[in-house]
């Protein structure tokens, strides 16, 4: 469960969220 938790927290960091939004926008 720990690796999943770390991965989840990494995905919730602002730079990653911004990158995801940019990717979805095209």
Swiss-Prot record:
UniProt subcellular location: Secreted
Organs and tissues of expression: Expressed by the venom gland.
Posttranslational modification: The glycine-PoTx is a non-amidated form of poneratoxin, with an extra-Gly at C-terminus. This loss of amidation does not alter toxin activity on Nav1.7/SCN9A.
In-chain residues carrying the UniProt-annotated modification Arginine amide: 25
Domain of life: Eukaryota
Coiled coil: none
Cellular component GO terms held in the UniProt record: extracellular region; host cell postsynaptic membrane; host cell presynaptic membrane
Molecular function (Gene Ontology), one example: sodium channel regulator activity
Annotated keywords: Amidation, Ion channel impairing toxin, Neurotoxin, Postsynaptic neurotoxin, Presynaptic neurotoxin, Secreted, Toxin, Voltage-gated sodium channel impairing toxin
Other comment: The variant A23E has an 8-fold reduction in potency compared to delta-paraponeritoxin-Pc1a. The variant D22N/A23V, has an ~5-fold increase in potency compared to delta-paraponeritoxin-Pc1a.
Name of protein: Glycyl-poneratoxin
Organism (species): Paraponera clavata
Taxonomic lineage: Eukaryota, Metazoa, Ecdysozoa, Arthropoda, Hexapoda
